[in-house]
Design a protein with these regions (language model features):
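N-terminal lobe/hinge region of extracytoplasmic solute-binding protein
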Residues: 47-98, 213-215
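Surface-exposed binding/hinge segments that line
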Residues: 95, 131, 135-201
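Alpha-helical secondary-structure segments
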Residues: 118-128, 173-179, 219, 248-250, ...
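Extracytoplasmic/peripheral linker and loop segments enriched in polar/acidic and small residues
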Residues: 169, 323, 335, 414-427, ...
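Gly/Pro-rich hinge or "lid" segments in bacterial periplasmic/extracellular proteins
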Residues: 180-246, 250
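Ligand-site clamp/hinge motif
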Residues: 205-208, 214, 239-284, 299
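Structural transition elements
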Residues: 344-379, 395-399
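Long beta-strand-rich cores associated with HINT superfamily self-processing modules
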Residues: 518-543
Length: 543
């Protein structure tokens, strides 16, 4: 989703217990403080957003529209500061002696906005719900490291043989343990992601109703009803106990289907914060907004994904076709002219903001080389028909999509066209259902700051965001090898070996690393965007 560096993800095996005691046992700080009395607290911040794809359940939200709302309404065991560093929130401590069994202690005094206490069972029940295959949760994959996942989420169409993971044990109201199938030192650092948020017991009584009106424990609470395709309003949560206390009265997230319109409203000061600038104004937004323009690196990548479940993209020669297409894309020119320097050509499948990023893993296959691209396509037997690229028109993608297929067409001499969908949800629905017929744009905003988060959720077999339906057992083995590693260097070596397989198979073509672009109105101050590319709404105040 979230998405989108991810975090200071690694704790080596030899220092795991000590580091966790120092980093995760202490109550962390942030730019906001729990005891602060917010100034200008009566003001509502007006934000541009997107319609969430699904009902608002943490374990079923894996896209930016819903992810933003989740981050406002819920708080996990940890959060991440503006640089991706882990900060304790609901967690009083997270400790381990072997990087396989972790003891989680929950702080006292936390409540959901309906008055229910946030306790150990709030997390354990939510994670078990998210993992159970019959619940069909998109984020189920994130619980795979936990012992017992295979029983609640078997491969294929098999029915689960258990309803809860035996690796999750509630000790008492404030303590639970998590036992992983294998040692994984980095596990705690992913616990700030949406999938790991707690749920109140009331959620399970009527999940459909809860998805429309979620009850969380975060900095904000829902204010009224979710008005679909119009707005979602949240107000400050008066019982919030964490460090991210809102310095404003709330956020009114207005749903836009056109970035040109949201930008026009920003210039008119009719909206306060915009995340994402339309490609149509990338050449002018810095001049228009001056110091209020945002253009900064973030853990977000843009790519072109192929539906490998369609016969034409699931042949031995189709790998070479995809490699040829990749070499036919003039990334340097597109990022410089169309994207106006707000993106950098990709050289791997991750992001420059994470440890393990590589400048050369993709090598020649991510470099513009018309001669080699033509030769490779010819060796693959050519391409028949029209190469279509699907995209959503509400995200400001038209110009770069057209520039991309024009580059491919001019280089390879094949017919290309764009297939426009009116909004993100319309594009994502057939992708999620596995019924998309053509290649399509994808963007990944990191969930937590680590190399494996650019790989496992997108390319592991059965992963919730494996839009290509990529399936390579050797790749999955390398992911597991990296997860079991006891040092950052060992893990990165395995993950990068997996990336090399991706270069060979090319289920997804890396395009560029996207900067966070955005802006804010003349009416607000203290506006910053985090390493995930998301505004830090709790700090924003009205002038």
């Amino acid at each position: 989703m979230r998405g989108t560096t991810r975090r200071a993800r690694w704790v080596s095996a030899t220092t795991t217990a000590a580091c966790l005691a120092l980093v995760l046992c202490a109550c962390g700080g942030n730019t906001s403080t729990g005891s602060a009395s917010p100034k200008a607290g009566g003001a509502i911040i007006l934000a541009a957003g997107m319609e969430p794809q699904n009902p608002l359940l943490p374990t079923n939200t894996n896209e930016a529209g819903g992810g933003l709302i989740m981050s406002l309404l819920f708080q996990g065991l940890i959060s991440y500061d503006s640089h991706g560093k882990s900060i304790n929130q609901v967690a009083a401590s997270i400790t381990t002696t072997d990087s396989q069994t972790f003891t989680m202690k929950v702080k006292a005094g936390w409540t959901f906005t309906n008055g229910e206490p946030v306790n150990a069972r709030s997390f354990v029940d939510a994670w078990n719900f998210g993992a159970l295959s019959t619940n069909n949760q998109l984020n189920a994959y994130f619980f795979e490291p936990i012992e017992g996942y295979a029983e609640v989420h078997p491969v294929g169409d098999a029915q689960p043989t258990a309803r809860t993971m035996n690796g999750l044990v509630v000790i008492n109201s404030s303590t639970f343990t998590v036992r992983l199938a294998t040692a994984q030192a980095s596990f705690p650092s992913r616990l700030g992601y949406t999938a790991f948020y707690p749920l109140p017991q009331s959620a399970y009584k009527n999940l459909k109703a809860f998805g429309e009106h979620p009850i969380g424990n975060g900095s904000y609470m829902l204010d009224g009803n979710w008005v679909h395709n119009v707005s979602i309003k949240v107000k400050r949560n008066p019982t919030y106990k964490g460090t991210l206390v809102a310095k404003n009265a709330g956020v009114d997230v207005k749903v836009y289907t056109d970035q040109i319109q949201s930008y026009a409203d920003l210039l008119a000061n009719d909206v306060d914060v915009v995340q994402g600038i339309s490609d149509g104004v990338l050449d002018s937004f810095k001049a228009d907004l001056g110091s209020r323009a945002i253009n900064q690196p973030s853990g977000t990548t843009d790519s072109l994904t192929f539906p490998l479940y369609q016969p034409e993209w699931n042949t031995a020669s189709s790998k070479q076709v995809r490699q040829a297409i990749s070499m036919a894309i003039d990334r340097q020119t597109i990022t410089k002219t169309v994207l106006q320097g707000t993106s950098t050509p990709a050289t791997d499948f991750s992001s420059p903001v994470v440890q393990g990023y590589s400048k050369d893993i993709c090598g020649e296959f991510c470099a513009f080389n018309p001669a080699k691209a033509k030769a490779l396509l010819a060796a693959a037997g050519g391409f028949k028909g029209t190469l279509e690229i699907a995209y959503n028109t509400d995200g400001g993608h038209k110009a770069w999509v057209e520039a991309t297929w024009n580059s491919i067409k001019a280089t390879l001499g094949i017919d290309c066209s764009a297939r426009a969908y009116p909004d993100r949800k319309s594009l994502r629905d057939p992708i999620t259902k596995g019924s998309m017929k053509v290649a399509f744009r994808t963007s990944w905003q990191m969930d937590y700051p680590a190399l494996e988060d650019f790989l496992a959720p997108i390319f592991a077999k059965g992963a919730g965001s494996n839009d290509a339906h990529y399936d390579n057992p050797s790749f999955d083995d390398l992911l597991q090898e990296g997860d079991k590693a006891t040092t950052p260097a060992e893990a990165i070596k395995s993950y990068q070996a997996g990336e090399k397989l991706l270069v060979t198979d090319m289920p997804v073509i890396p395009l560029w690393y996207a900067n966070t672009t955005g802006g804010y109105s003349e009416n607000v101050s203290n506006v910053k965007f985090d390493v995930f590319g998301v505004p830090i709404f709790t700090d924003i105040t009205r002038k």
